[in-house]
């Protein structure tokens, strides 16, 4: 890992954090961006939240994560876009980008010469996916949906050995 991380013309030194607004090329739209370049070597994780503007829990989680992590304690880098569909967020639109009526989640890999949804997807596909070792796209219940708390923890079934197994009989 080098001492700097470069993303979309931004350079972030090792052990530092950057919070800024990222312009979507060919538009007047800017997306909130947080980059944490950890003090130690490690992989790069890309996190997107708010592909659907009304999915508030993922947006809030990404914002809190960006605020709370100390780059001096991080191995690798974390890049977060939150909310990606900033126009849908402000307009309280559940599934679409208001300017073009498209579901941003359905237009990847995007098109730099297309509509706002396509340009946004194109920016993420061309500038962020190549940087990432891992990618997490946060989705959740939307504006009209009821959220019930739950945790899903997959694990392997483990059974204790029987006395016969232990004795070898």
Which residues make up each language-model segment?
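Short glycine- and acidic-rich boundary segments immediately preceding or forming the N-terminal edge
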Residues: 1-28
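Short gly/ser/thr-rich secondary-structure transition/capping motifs
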Residues: 27-30, 117-119
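Short beta-strand-to-loop junctions in surface cap/lid or active-site-entrance loops
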Residues: 33-41
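Active-site/substrate-binding loop(s) of hydrolase catalytic cores
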Residues: 42-43, 56-66, 70-160
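Short HxH-centered metal-ligating active-site micro-motif
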Residues: 49
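Single conserved hydrophobic/aromatic residue that forms the stacking wall/gate
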Residues: 158-169
